[in-house]
């Protein structure tokens, strides 16, 4: 079963911006309680959406470049990219159903 991929500042452009499939980037930190709450949800969804959508994780403690460039001020923040452009953003922990709804909308975009 697919899992979220780890992304660092050094490979963000390659793994996220140049991806052929939409990418949901989870900006998180190990000390963040809500981040730990949504981690198993994102693990599950990574498997269910494998091949159609990629879920990536960026540890903001270790990778500040893109978090800063994208104006990430609170975590968890999920930023959704399609064709190298930001098409959506969610700040804070949300229920699994909301993630599914948003991921499905992104996949339905032309």
Swiss-Prot record:
<feature type="disulfide bond" description="Redox-active">
    <location>
        <begin position="32"/>
        <end position="35"/>
    </location>
</feature>
<comment type="function">
    <text>Participates in various redox reactions through the reversible oxidation of its active center dithiol to a disulfide and catalyzes dithiol-disulfide exchange reactions.</text>
</comment>
<dbReference type="GO" id="GO:0005829">
    <property type="term" value="C:cytosol"/>
</dbReference>
<keyword id="KW-1015">Disulfide bond</keyword>
<feature type="modified residue" description="N6-methyllysine; alternate">
    <location>
        <position position="105"/>
    </location>
</feature>
<dbReference type="Pfam" id="PF00085">
    <property type="entry name" value="Thioredoxin"/>
</dbReference>
<keyword id="KW-0249">Electron transport</keyword>
<feature type="domain" description="Thioredoxin">
    <location>
        <begin position="3"/>
        <end position="108"/>
    </location>
</feature>
<dbReference type="InterPro" id="IPR017937">
    <property type="entry name" value="Thioredoxin_CS"/>
</dbReference>
<feature type="modified residue" description="N6,N6-dimethyllysine; alternate">
    <location>
        <position position="105"/>
    </location>
</feature>
<dbReference type="InterPro" id="IPR013766">
    <property type="entry name" value="Thioredoxin_domain"/>
</dbReference>
<comment type="similarity">
    <text>Belongs to the thioredoxin family.</text>
</comment>
<dbReference type="InterPro" id="IPR036249">
    <property type="entry name" value="Thioredoxin-like_sf"/>
</dbReference>
<dbReference type="InterPro" id="IPR005746">
    <property type="entry name" value="Thioredoxin"/>
</dbReference>
<dbReference type="GO" id="GO:0045454">
    <property type="term" value="P:cell redox homeostasis"/>
</dbReference>
<keyword id="KW-0676">Redox-active center</keyword>
<keyword id="KW-0488">Methylation</keyword>
<protein>
    <recommendedName>
        <fullName>Thioredoxin</fullName>
    </recommendedName>
</protein>
<dbReference type="GO" id="GO:0005737">
    <property type="term" value="C:cytoplasm"/>
</dbReference>
<dbReference type="GO" id="GO:0015035">
    <property type="term" value="F:protein-disulfide reductase activity"/>
</dbReference>
<keyword id="KW-0813">Transport</keyword>
């Amino acid at each position: 079963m697919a899992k979220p991929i780890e992304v660092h500042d050094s490979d963000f452009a390659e793994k996220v911006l140049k991806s052929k499939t939409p990418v949901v980037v989870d900006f998180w930190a190990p000390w963040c309680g809500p981040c730990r709450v949504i981690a198993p949800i994102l693990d599950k969804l990574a498997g269910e959406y494998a091949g159609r959508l990629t879920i990536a994780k960026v540890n903001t403690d270790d990778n500040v470049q893109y978090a800063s460039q994208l104006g990430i001020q609170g975590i968890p923040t999920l930023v959704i990219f399609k064709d190298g452009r930001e098409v959506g953003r969610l700040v804070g922990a949300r229920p699994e159903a909301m993630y599914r709804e948003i991921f499905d909308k992104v996949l339905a975009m032309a």
